[in-house]
């Protein structure tokens, strides 16, 4: 997996909709208050703090592959809250967590078969996963714009061996993955969370963090701003609505699964 470095503070300012989805996801879980919780791709740590508040007699650990994200997250202090710089693909926990949570992060992980195996291993008996991430059809406008842009003559040479940064599966595709792991029960839902950004500035903040990050990494410094401006111009032109808002398709996949009980 290729890792990318994000600006934690800029992401915090641009991730209003991700936080809304995350709080909705947290509200779905019935906490006892003493769980050990792992947050995969914790980002700026705001949602991990909400998890910590939900388990006053438990613990919440947030992990992220971005140093800057973890630095931002570590400005949040709770006695039962910890953040660690760790690539999700390299986690090696065993029988440690009652809940593995993730919001708006796991579409950055390419190998979900291994992710599911590692997560199953990390859960205690009867432990649960609760994930929400980009699914099939997510960010359709941006993906169309960026795919055309990186194939243009001025930029194509920098993307010859480029590894696409996201994995956004359909419900059927993910059902095939999870059914092979051994969870005692699981539910997969596809969700339409299409969004109208209130103005151009709001959409641009989202384009900058996180959408453009993996593509700007490929381009020489002297071309980065030109590339950025061209993408932004095309996105605003393509997505502007008559009322001055800007539309993007957000299609989510939500995963709930429970590990089997211990066999005696």
Give the positions of each predicted feature.
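A short SAM/SAH-binding and catalytic strip from SAM-dependent methyltransferases
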Residues: 99-112
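A short glycine-rich, Lys/Arg-flanked "PGG" loop and its adjoining helix->strand segment in the class I
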Residues: 113-128
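Class I SAM-dependent methyltransferase SAM/SAH-binding core
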Residues: 38-40, 44-91
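A short acidic, Gly/Pro-enriched loop at the edge of an enzyme's catalytic core
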Residues: 89-100
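Conserved class I S-adenosyl-L-methionine
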Residues: 1-35, 46-50, 69-72, 130-153
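Conserved Class I S-adenosyl-L-methionine
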Residues: 46, 167-264
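A structural alpha-helix within SAM-dependent methyltransferase catalytic domains
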Residues: 26, 49-52, 116-120, 147
């Amino acid at each position: 997996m290729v890792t990318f470095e994000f600006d934690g503070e800029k992401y915090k300012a641009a991730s209003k909709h991700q936080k809304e989805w995350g709080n909705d996801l947290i509200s779905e879980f019935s906490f006892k208050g003493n769980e050990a919780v792992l947050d995969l791709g914790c980002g700026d740590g705001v949602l991990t703090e909400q998890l910590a508040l939900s388990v006053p007699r438990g613990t919440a650990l947030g992990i992220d592959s971005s140093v800057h994200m973890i630095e931002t997250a570590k400005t949040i202090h709770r006695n039962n809250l910890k953040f660690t710089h760790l690539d999700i693909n390299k986690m090696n926990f065993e029988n440690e967590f009652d809940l593995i949570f993730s919001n708006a992060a796991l579409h950055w992980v390419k190998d979900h078969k291994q992710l599911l195996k590692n997560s199953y291993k990390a859960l205690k008996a009867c432990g649960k996963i609760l994930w929400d991430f980009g699914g099939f059809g997510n960010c359709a406008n941006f993906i169309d714009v960026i795919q055309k842009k990186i194939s243009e003559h001025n930029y194509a040479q920098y993307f010859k061996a480029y590894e696409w940064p996201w994995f956004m599966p359909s419900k059927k595709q993910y059902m095939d993955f999870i059914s092979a792991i051994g969870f005692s029960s699981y539910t997969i839902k596809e969700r339409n969370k299409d969004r109208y950004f209130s103005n151009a500035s709001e959409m641009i903040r989202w384009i900058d963090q996180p959408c453009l990050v993996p593509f700007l990494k490929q381009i020489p410094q002297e071309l980065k701003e030109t590339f950025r401006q061209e993408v932004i111009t095309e996105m605003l032109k393509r997505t502007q609505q008559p009322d001055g808002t800007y539309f993007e398709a957000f299609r989510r996949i939500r995963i709930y699964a429970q590990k089997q009980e211990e066999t005696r």
